């Protein structure tokens, strides 16, 4: 049997297990206590807990009968609004199991539906409002038509803060017998950008080959440059060995497939930790910002990165010729 994805394995099953979204939880708890609720619209970036919260709400509403009373649909997977209409019709024609006054339809990626399909969805929501409630999940609320928004209680889901993501990742690592280093958490958070699903999946991939997960293990699990490679490339350029630095750069670009912008982000991340004078760090930071801007404007990646290495060599040469601040007086 294939190993369960950790994201599913550690998906919260109750409001108490959800480590974020306190305001959302408070309002949804009121619906559960009252035994009734309007249609709901959850929107926000991927991996911010929309599906998880919808399923938690179903469990809290229906208890052991939550599966019988819940229909999950994906607007992107279904073959048009007619299929959704027929499935909802079939689902809604029977009474809820247990004491619940209504059934629940969870429709993911609702913002991928056309305006015409959303108009049809609005009519479906009205048609079965007596015994069915809808939870619509969307990345972008701006892509949902106003007539649907006006019929829903709207909840915004934000990326998870670093502190809470770190807490959750440490819990999972401990449960799986994994030693999770702080630098790995930093890199996972940077790569995932607060997307908890992506963060947990990345942790699982990084842990597949080692019981100790550090930043290098995380980088190896992605197309990101490893911190060790960043330091090596920087030291080669900064110490004047531009030829080897170019060879290393081309290896990382064309063998490992590292993108130009990822080099810049990696240099910026490692620069903070490097044992350099503040003046030198400031000069390098300005250089990185310059190259970053050129890359965003569509300049050739290799040429810009070679320029970066050349300038790092010049900065390193000046730094070696300049006495430290304490000896300048």
Swiss-Prot record:
Tagged with keyword Nucleotide-binding: yes
CDD domains: AAA (cd00009), HLD_clamp_RFC (cd18140)
GO cellular component: DNA replication factor C complex
Keywords: ATP-binding, DNA replication, Nucleotide-binding
Binding site for ATP: 44-51
Pfam family, any one: AAA
Swiss-Prot/TrEMBL GO biological process terms: DNA repair; DNA-templated DNA replication
One GO MF term attached to the UniProt entry: DNA binding
Summary of the function given for this chain in its UniProt record: Part of the RFC clamp loader complex which loads the PCNA sliding clamp onto DNA.
Quaternary structure annotation from Swiss-Prot or TrEMBL: Heteromultimer composed of small subunits (RfcS) and large subunits (RfcL).
Family: Belongs to the activator 1 small subunits family. RfcS subfamily.
Protein name listed in UniProt: Replication factor C small subunit 1
Source organism: Pyrobaculum arsenaticum (strain DSM 13514 / JCM 11321 / PZ6)
Chain's gene name: rfcS1
